[in-house]
A protein has these predicted regions:
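Solvent-exposed interaction patches of small proteins and small membrane subunits
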Residues: 1-91
Length: 91
């Protein structure tokens, strides 16, 4: 799957998320107000959503398109449907 997505972009985003989660962990130990911690959790969640968009876009641009072009449209549509359902469940 790596060849089908923007891996460099995805890795950059994931490293940022790792930093955000580590910062949240430190905030808990530093007795930071709950509202501030929740704001950072929301930011990390939004960043994960952005990663999901990158993966979904790669899936559509490559996996689904390849399936349709090679005459396996039904399988490509099923794969697309599953990917969209999983992405929607992230919300």
């Amino acid at each position: 799957m790596k060849q089908y997505m923007d891996a460099e972009n995805l890795h950059r985003r994931l490293k940022k998320i790792i930093g955000q989660v580590q910062a949240i962990d430190r905030m808990v130990d530093e007795d930071i107000p709950c509202e501030d911690i929740l704001a950072q959790i929301n930011a990390a969640k939004s960043a994960l959503n952005g990663c999901g968009k990158v993966v979904l876009e790669g899936h559509i641009q490559h996996c689904v398109r390849d399936g349709i072009q090679h005459g396996d449209a039904d399988k490509a549509i099923e794969s697309f449907t599953q990917a969209v359902e999983r992405f929607a469940n992230m919300q």
